[in-house]
UniProtKB/Swiss-Prot annotation:
NCBIfam families: EF-Tu, PRK00049.1, PRK12735.1, PRK12736.1, small_GTP. Residues 81-84 are annotated as: G3. Belongs to the TRAFAC class translation factor GTPase superfamily. Classic translation factor GTPase family. EF-Tu/EF-1A subfamily. Residues 19-26 are annotated as: G1. This is Elongation factor Tu. Monomer. Its EC number is 3.6.5.3. Residues 174-176 are annotated as: G5. Residues 60-64 are annotated as: G2. Mg(2+) binds at residue 26. It holds the Pfam family GTP_EFTU_D3.
Length: 394
C-alpha cells in the first residue's frame, strides 16, 4: 500500500498532556482522538494503543512517548502523551516533543498533587507557552463547591509559576465517560477542542524568525573566499545581506556573497535547508565550528545561565556515581562542546544519576544563546545529561 500524501490544509500545532500520575492523561488523549474523529474525521486511538508507548531516543536519552494526531474545526494537532513521570521530565527537558501548548489534567477527586506542581514548574522552565486545564473525573464529584475549590487551587498554582491563572480556560469533564460515548461528557471534549483553537496562538514558523545557522564546517575556496556550512535553523539568508558571526570569539560582522546547496548557486537559504554560505573578507581561521551565523543583533554570546537538567541514569549509559559542586563537564551546544563549571541550588550537595536538577552554569567560552536553548552534558564525548537554558544571566 502506498503512503497517502499528507495534505496540509489546516495550520499545524503541537500539544501534549501533562499532570499527576493516574489523573487520566492517557484516557483523555484516547477520548480526544475518539470524540474528534467522529466529528472532524481522522482515526480514533484506543487507550492501550497509547499506553504502550514506543521507546525513542532524543539526544542519547531513551524516552517512552506516544504520538497521536487529530483535527479540530480549524487546526491539525500533533499530541504527545508519556506513560511515566520520568518520561515527562526527560521529554520536556530535551525538547524531544516541543509543545506550543499543554493540556494539564487534574482529577477533581484529588485536586493538584506533587507532579501537577512539578509539571507546571517544568513547563515554565522549559518554555511551554500556554496551558489549558482539563478538570477530569467530574462525574465522580457531586459537590459544586468542591469543584470550585479545586479550580481555585489550580489557578493559584498556575499563577505561582507565572502562568495567567485567572484567565486560564478550565474545562470540567470526564475523559472515561466521553470515551464510553456519553453525549453529555463528549460535549466537554468538543469544548476543549474549541479552547485549543482559540487559546493557543499559532506559533511563528521557523522561516519567519530571525536568521540563524549553526556552523558545522568551514572551508576556504581559492579565489572565492571562505564558506561555512550547516543547516539553517531559523529564518532566511539572502545573498547580499549582512550577518554576524557569534560565539566563542568576539562577535564580527560580514556579508553573505553567495548561498549554495548541492553545488548549485541559490539566491537564498531557508530554514531546514543544508547550505554553504560564502562570506566576504573573512579568513578561514577567524571562524570555527560552534559559532553561529545570525541576523545582526538577533542573538548574543553568553557564558552564565540558569538551567533545568536531567542527569542520565546508569541504565541509560550515564554516570555510575553522583557528582558534586565543582563538577566540570563539557556542555554541547548545537555543534560543539564547551567546558563549564556548575553551581547547585542551596542545600544540595550532590546530584545522583537519574535526578533532575536546577543548576547555574558558567562556560569558559561564550556561546550564542537565548532562553530555551537545549544542550547536552558530556564527559569525553559520552552524553551524561540533557538540559535547557531557563534564564540567561551573563
Amino acid at each position: 500500500m502506498s503512503k497517502e500524501k499528507f495534505q496540509r490544509l489546516k495550520p499545524h500545532i503541537n500539544v501534549g498532556t501533562i499532570g499527576h500520575v493516574d489523573h487520566g492523561k492517557t484516557t483523555l488523549t484516547a477520548a480526544i482522538t475518539t470524540v474528534l474523529s467522529k466529528k472532524f474525521g481522522g482515526s480514533a486511538r484506543a487507550f492501550d494503543q497509547i499506553d504502550n508507548a514506543p521507546e525513542e531516543k532524543a539526544r542519547g536519552i531513551t524516552i517512552n512517548t506516544s504520538h497521536v494526531e487529530y483535527d479540530t474545526e480549524f487546526r491539525h494537532y500533533a499530541h504527545v502523551d508519556c506513560p511515566g513521570h520520568a518520561d515527562y521530565i526527560k521529554n520536556m527537558i530535551t525538547g524531544a516533543a516541543q509543545m506550543d501548548g499543554a493540556i494539564l489534567v487534574v482529577a477533581a477527586t484529588d485536586g493538584p498533587m506533587p507532579q501537577t506542581r512539578e509539571h507546571i514548574l517544568l513547563g515554565r522552565q522549559v518554555g511551554v507557552p500556554y496551558i489549558i486545564v482539563f478538570l477530569n473525573k467530574c462525574d465522580m464529584v457531586d459537590d459544586e463547591e468542591l469543584l470550585e475549590l479545586v479550580e481555585m487551587e489550580v489557578r493559584d498554582l498556575l499563577t505561582q509559576y507565572d502562568f495567567p491563572g485567572d484567565d486560564t480556560p478550565i474545562i470540567r469533564g470526564s475523559a472515561l465517560k466521553a470515551l464510553e460515548g456519553d453525549p453529555e461528557w463528549e460535549s466537554k471534549i468538543i469544548d476543549l477542542s474549541k479552547f485549543l483553537d482559540s487559546y493557543i496562538p499559532e506559533p511563528k514558523r521557523a522561516v519567519d524568525q530571525p536568521f540563524l545557522l549553526p556552523i558545522e564546517d568551514v572551508f576556504s575556496i581559492s579565489g572565492r573566499g571562505t564558506v561555512v556550512t550547516g543547516r539553517v535553523e531559523k529564518g532566511i539568508i539572502k545573498v547580499g545581506e549582512e550577518v554576524e558571526i557569534v560565539g566563542i570569539k568576539k562577535t564580527t560582522k560580514t556579508t553573505c556573497t553567495g548561498v549554495e546547496m548541492f553545488r548549485k548557486l541559490l539566491d537564498e537559504g531557508r530554514a531546514g535547508e543544508n547550505v554553504g554560505v560564502l562570506l566576504r573578507g573573512t579568513k578561514r581561521d577567524e571562524i570555527e565550528r560552534g559559532q553561529v551565523l545570525a541576523k545582526p543583533g538577533s542573538i548574543h554570546p553568553h557564558t552564565t545561565f540558569e538551567s533545568e537538567v536531567y542527569v542520565l541514569s546508569k541504565e541509560e549509559g550515564g554516570r555510575h556515581t553522583p557528582f558534586f559542586k565543582g563538577y566540570r563537564p563539557q556542555f554541547y551546544f548545537r555543534t560543539t562542546d564547551v567546558t563549564g563549571s556548575i553551581e547547585l541550588p542551596e542545600g544540595i550537595e550532590m546530584v545522583m544519576p537519574g535526578d533532575n536538577i536546577k543548576m547555574t552554569v558558567t562556560l569558559i567560552n561564550p556561546i550564542a544563546m537565548a532562553d530555551g536553548l537545549r544542550f547536552a552534558i558530556r564527559e569525553g564525548g559520552r552524553t551524561v545529561g540533557a538540559g535547557v537554558v531557563s534564564k540567561v544571566l551573563l
